Amino acid sequence: MPRYCAAICCKNRRGRNNKDRKLSFYPFPLHDKERLEKWLKNMKRDSWVPSKYQFLCSDHFTPDSLDIRWGIRYLKQTAVPTIFSLPEDNQGKDPSKKKSQKKNLEDEKEVCPKAKSEESFVLNETKKNIVNTDVPHQHPELLHSSSLVKPPAPKTGSIQNNMLTLNLVKQHTGKPESTLETSVNQDTGRGGFHTCFENLNSTTITLTTSNSESIHQSLETQEVLEVTTSHLANPNFTSNSMEIKSAQENPFLFSTINQTVEELNTNKESVIAIFVPAENSKPSVNSFISAQKETTEMEDTDIEDSLYKDVDYGTEVLQIEHSYCRQDINKEHLWQKVSKLHSKITLLELKEQQTLGRLKSLEALIRQLKQENWLSEENVKIIENHFTTYEVTMI
């Protein structure tokens, strides 16, 4: 059963947080009632009755009340604990209360931006983006044709007022110049683009968008958007391409927009769909699909590279561990190594035969000497001792 301190505001326990400092635990003086009363008074627990399994740690005693002998701290017989912290002092230090206060503050912080975003959404819900066109009106009769494009919904509270100036450049001088009136309405969930023009067989439209004060500070440069509409032979089909050129000369081509328009007169009118993305809007479906393709391609290339790296690592390990399994070595070189090994084996066999012959000759000599009584047991022991001492000195 682990020991722990019985004081109210003390969390010391044996085996925990005792690496930097030494803690010792002392039992209550149950047999000395006067001393026990002093302990309980200092602890502010007069009515409490401790048991023999409860202890106080050394943090509650002064150094004078401890007797150190052979590195062990013993409690003196007259020692009384005097160092105690009241629960009122530790109310501010309670971690559970601190955590609850932090949670309350976080909840308040979360509620405040939500309320602010709702208020800004209500205020900005009726704002619109207005487009002004500077085109000379020479012909009062206009044929209206409209096309609706739904851009992705921007985030709440980020609706902005942008001003667009359009300048038309007519290629066919024989026909009257066309007039273009556009209006952009952007809400949080809907987006529309309405165009009214005539005689746009082959025109180039240049849109210069100047950012207003409410636009994000990161988009400080102006952007030029060029839309080219080329009318085909088929009266019910137009091919439109749109390109954005930023001030940093980093153009990127939007997806080609193909639209089929019913009951369209080739000589008088054509339809163009212009998609103007908001700054904080979400990416379109085509860009999302292309991004997914890019990510999958990158993942495939990473997997292939990792596989190639694993194969290279495996070949390196094989080349290091098994010197005869290298792919760089030719067969001729391997056969040369095999022949060298065979020659070494034959040399070892010859040496073995020579040593065996010498041993047999020595055994024959010893037998002959024993038969002729040239060697007695004493002489044999002397010779054996001589050989053993010689071997020891050699070792």
UniProtKB/Swiss-Prot annotation:
Any one annotated GO CC term: chromatin
Coiled-coil stretches: 348-382
Changes after translation: Cleaved by HTRA2 during apoptosis.
GO biological process: negative regulation of cell cycle; negative regulation of transcription by RNA polymerase II
InterPro entries on file: THAP_domain_protein, THAP_Znf
Cell location: Nucleus
SUPFAM superfamilies, per database record: Glucocorticoid receptor-like (DNA-binding domain) (SSF57716)
Spans annotated as Disordered: 85-112
Tissue specificity statement from the Swiss-Prot or TrEMBL entry: Detected in heart. Detected in brain and muscle (at protein level). Highly expressed in the heart. Also found in brain and skeletal muscle.
Short sequence motif named HCFC1-binding motif (HBM), residue ranges: 321-324
Keyword list, A-Z: Cell cycle, Coiled coil, DNA-binding, Metal-binding, Nucleus, Repressor, Transcription, Transcription regulation, Zinc, Zinc-finger
The keyword Transmembrane is annotated on this UniProt entry: no
Zinc finger (THAP-type): 1-84
Any one Pfam family match given in the protein's UniProt record, by short name: THAP
SMART domains: DM3, THAP
Regions of compositional bias (Basic and acidic residues) in chain numbering: 90-112
Major site of localization recorded for this protein: nucleus
Induction: Up-regulated both in response to UV light treatment and cisplatin, agents that cause DNA damage (at protein level).
The keyword Repressor appears for this protein: yes
One Gene Ontology term of the molecular function aspect: DNA binding
Role of this protein: Has sequence-specific DNA-binding activity and can function as transcriptional repressor (in vitro). May be a regulator of cell cycle: THAP5 overexpression in human cell lines causes cell cycle arrest at G2/M phase.
Assembly mode: Interacts with HTRA2; under apoptotic conditions. Interacts with ABRAXAS2.
Protein's UniProt name: THAP domain-containing protein 5
Organism: Homo sapiens
